């Protein structure tokens, strides 16, 4: 039986509310001063299986009563063999659920673990209910560091002798031929503190030589924790406010501060054109909240979290900041979390994982480039950082600020409906800086005049001109979301599903499949739209583009930035720094070159194969294409110089391409939201994907169809259909798409599937995951 605390949690979760401090009897306070000692703890065991996705009650040893709180990572005896397992405390109390003599005792606190706050435990519970994950999966998500990391210790040998005693000790050691001891004592003449590493490596000392000197009172060993990662001594000192805000920026700051100072905690959407100075606004909002002693989380997509970006915040806030990114080692990440947990920093900057920073006095969460797909987790729990940030802000009484030049349709619709406060920035921040002039190059017309080059005539001429003037250019390969679709080189149209309006995917060499409804046709030899024989799968790569550009412009200095060239630690920074220092004329890359970078020397951006992402089998393909093209175009003309952009496409008439060329978000939004309403896609409805996986194909088919029949009684269902990769490691996979009006219905759907699974033993072999759009 569950403890009262977990029962109460379940009751609140059923009403789509996270448990509150007043209504849930968890006693989850972090500070131990004056708090009663509990006898029992409810613990989730660190085993990823639904059958143990419940708390187990353990007795708290008297000697650990003051150390264990909600969120503490502990080791406990588990199962018939009482093998030691890791678990997380999710509740505490003084009432035994069954015979106290049968309740096992906590073995100890896990080495190197940090106690997460009660707020994060409640957030994990909310994520469990929202995304259909196990409590163990959500707890692992909110815990600071997955690996058990030890602090890096720095040991120093400190001399305890005065000068006279030191000389006498040297003479005594020389007489007894203690050569190693003599080397160390002589080193103490110049420095009373010798790093242990230096003593062992340079002086060739062993612990056997050091211990007797310590026992005789000649030296002591000082131990300190050494921070891994950034060398704060080399960072720029904070300079305070250095940028004067324009009227639009100041209006956005004033609106936020007015609400903040009156106690209103809202969600704000800063919609600013590329180069409008959203970062300066973020820093002003952060400064206001920090003045009250509050803490701030700033989420930035991993791809944009470059040295250049980080330094902008260090110049303003100094070492109040901790940074997270995937290029940090596990030890470096551990140190950053420890700094946050101890209150040594007030700002955590990083990708979506930074959302779970152990801040107890959170005042503001900012999400830069809130439209980015990187904020959606692709593993369980399949959460979206924007949704989880809203819940964490609610739990902590913090404000939430979203920012983007190309907001997600979900966020912009909420702003239009009054759920978010819209803060527009219509103009570029730098005086005299204007949006670039954009031209669309129709690649169908290029082919008709015999130009089979990857460069249109317009882009070729502009590149030649820029190189002659000593200016820089960026060539962007739009490969985000690339899949093996089929398109016509003559008319530019991709082969789409007649039922779902998404591109068909090429399977093998001769079969086209829709991954939404399962529609299948053989690969045709002629374009169904224009009859042209020039129809085939589409493929492109940055490496081939680099080779072609070097042949076409042999004197140009060229850099390439993609997954291959940035694989090593520091690879991003090295390439971006070289380009910023004018060590190259042309930078070629995928979306990582267009994410928030500011290069004053760039006056031309060429976007190659702009419609690649239009042809992905996803109802969001037009939205993602518009976002990428707009972000890429925004890199040109940022330092007062006029900028040009050339968009090369086989579908110049598409509204996403036209709106991106016009840098007009409202134009795109009006078209796209009508499309979503027409086909009943989010954000005008709620949509979920239920993933079924099983090693027995027949069982998979039967169970997936059984679920679809049951769910069609209460919701619109599409499928089940084979997953894009149907078989992985001998496991077959199918997807069932569900559309409904409210999130509450999705919660009921999970309950219905669980009821089905509990009633039939066939389901024991089927794994189920949920993905909420």
Regions from the language model: what does each represent?
Residues 112, 678, 724-726:
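Outer-membrane beta-barrel proteins
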Residues 2-404, 416-430, 706, 737, ...:
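Accessory, non-ATPase domains that flank or precede helicase/AAA+ motor cores in DNA-metabolism machines
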Residues 559, 714-723, 764-772:
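Short beta-strand elements
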Residues 38-40, 53, 82, 470, ...:
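A general secondary-structure signal for short beta-strands and their flanking turns/coil
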